[in-house]
Amino acid sequence: FDGSLLSFEENIKETKKIASICHQFGMGIEGELGHVGIAANGDEKDESIYTDPLDAERFAKETGVDCLAIAVGTAHGEYPKGLIPHINFQRIREVKEATNNMPIALHGGSGSGDENILKAVEAGINKVNMVTDVLVSMREYTRKRLEENPKIGYINLMMEVEENVKSFIERWIDLTGSCGKAALFKPVDRVGLLTPKCAIGLGE
């Protein structure tokens, strides 16, 4: 749940409410504190929207979120060509310590480059969002194949794009040390969640 544009108190209130519902259904929830802006606007340079470690400590305790997305110098979307954001790795470490080593997420990871992402993971980031990089990879591969063969069939092209993006994602999984971690995730009994008891609990 992204309540980062709300006031701090409202963010806590709304995130806590949603966390309570999610936990009744055996679901995890990610909250967001500090605003991850838009790359095209240059928002990544605005340190005033970075996550404050003391705020993060209180937010984590009062909301009960399972993961916290923080703002440390990245932004959503595609950066201008040649621009690589400056990530505040020390802030990551400070938030990690303040929240008692809880899982933390980095939004706007696209365009940050291998070195930045690896340093962020080393500093304590557990999850990286980078859908823009995935979409750009698909776009550029599509452009390349259409230049090579303008008459390529649409279905064949999409199948090629899918295989190409799989390789792109697999590379990032390996690079960040995420490979072989599926056993850490537990399946949710969705049949059990549909019992009347759970439905009543949701409405309380």
Feature locations, PLM:
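Alpha/beta enzyme core
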Residues: 1-102, 114-125, 136, 140-143, ...
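Active-site neighborhood of phospho(di)ester-bond hydrolases with catalytic His/Asp-centered motifs
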Residues: 104-106
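Short acidic/histidine-rich active-site segments
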Residues: 108-112, 130
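Generic structural hydrophobic/aromatic packing signal, biased to beta-strands
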Residues: 128-130, 172
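Glycine-rich phosphate/pyrophosphate-binding loops
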Residues: 133
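Extended, intrinsically disordered, low-complexity segments
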Residues: 144-204
